[in-house]
Amino acid sequence: MAKKITGYIRLQIKAGEANPSPPVGPALGQHGVNIREFCESFNTATKNIEKGLPTPVIITVYADRTFSFITKTPPASVLLKKFVLKGKSGSARPNTEKVGKATRQQLEEIAKMKTPDLTAADLEAAIRTIAGTARSMGIDVEGVE
């Protein structure tokens, strides 16, 4: 018989940097989860992701206070800032003030990283999804309609 689920916790934690301080500690403590055990297993699971990239995680908490978790890929906006804007932030007025240019190749690279978490049917649809995010951040998109 499957374990009884008592809750889900959604957090965004920097890869390889989970520690018991807020927001991790209080969120897990409310559900009675062993915080140190989660931090160690999360840091181990995210060791192949670049350290410091915000990584969404969905934690499933069971009645016996055990847990399991699923890590997702970093948000598209974070990847766009990293690869296209080189750390700068997006535009406050994206329709009038452009802050950078994204090539189709850059968008394709990000789309390939995000494919497991996107609902896109194919790579082309994933590229268009990432291009939409880029446009909403004030990034000019080249080579994508």
From Swiss-Prot:
Xref: Gene3D superfamilies: Ribosomal protein L11, C-terminal domain, Ribosomal protein L11/L12, N-terminal domain
PTM remark: One or more lysine residues are methylated.
PROSITE patterns for this protein: RIBOSOMAL_L11
Gene Ontology BP term (one): translation
A single GO cellular-component term on record: cytosolic large ribosomal subunit
Record keywords, A-Z: Methylation, Ribonucleoprotein, Ribosomal protein, RNA-binding, rRNA-binding
GO molecular function: large ribosomal subunit rRNA binding; structural constituent of ribosome
Pfam families: Ribosomal_L11, Ribosomal_L11_N
Quaternary organization: Part of the ribosomal stalk of the 50S ribosomal subunit. Interacts with L10 and the large rRNA to form the base of the stalk. L10 forms an elongated spine to which L12 dimers bind in a sequential fashion forming a multimeric L10(L12)X complex.
Record-linked NCBIfam families: L11_bact (TIGR01632)
Function: Forms part of the ribosomal stalk which helps the ribosome interact with GTP-bound translation factors.
Family (UniProt): Belongs to the universal ribosomal protein uL11 family.
Designated name of the protein: Large ribosomal subunit protein uL11
The organism of origin for this protein: Coxiella burnetii (strain RSA 493 / Nine Mile phase I)
Gene name of this polypeptide: rplK
